[in-house]
Amino acid sequence: MDREFLDPSSLSSAPLLILPGAGDQFDFGAYATHWKIDGSQTGGRFAVVHHPLMPHTLGAPLHRHHREDEYSYVLTGTFGALLGDAVVTAQTGTWVFKPRGQWHTFWNAGDAPCEIIEVISPAGFENYWRELRTVWPDRN
């Protein structure tokens, strides 16, 4: 039997079905963050966010994480990334691993919208976008 949960933020250890469009979001304009699974729901083990990117949009400036690994799955479009010294282009269905400590940036490398699902482990970094939302409230 399928179970549907309209408010996944209220769950901590129950099975979880996240409906399309569910979850909080922050819109940067040509780039957005949609929270799908929060660290509070996984005991801090991981978080999952959805990032739609408009064509030729930079997703993040060059940066690195000291505690998180990131795994990006390309749902649609062409995903470009600088991973250390390597520039990669990933098409629909491709996973891109960005290990902690590695300098990286990413962008939509195509002429059509690109969407990625990002798994962040351990959880916590998903709160960065929540912090941005508080200092940039006109983007909510």
What are these regions (language model features)?
Residues 67-79, 84:
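Glycine- and acidic-residue-biased ligand/ion/polar-headgroup-sensing regions
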Residues 22-62, 68-69, 124:
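A short glycine-rich, His/Asp/Glu-containing loop-to-beta-strand
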Residues 44, 100-126:
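Ligand-binding loop in jelly-roll beta-barrel domains
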Residues 52, 78-80, 119:
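Residue-level recognition of well-ordered beta-strand positions that form the cores
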Residues 130-140:
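Acidic/histidine-enriched, glycine/proline-rich intrinsically disordered or flexible terminal extensions
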Residues 1-35:
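Extreme N-terminal tail/first-helix region
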Residues 26, 85-103:
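Short acidic-glycine-tyrosine-enriched beta hairpin
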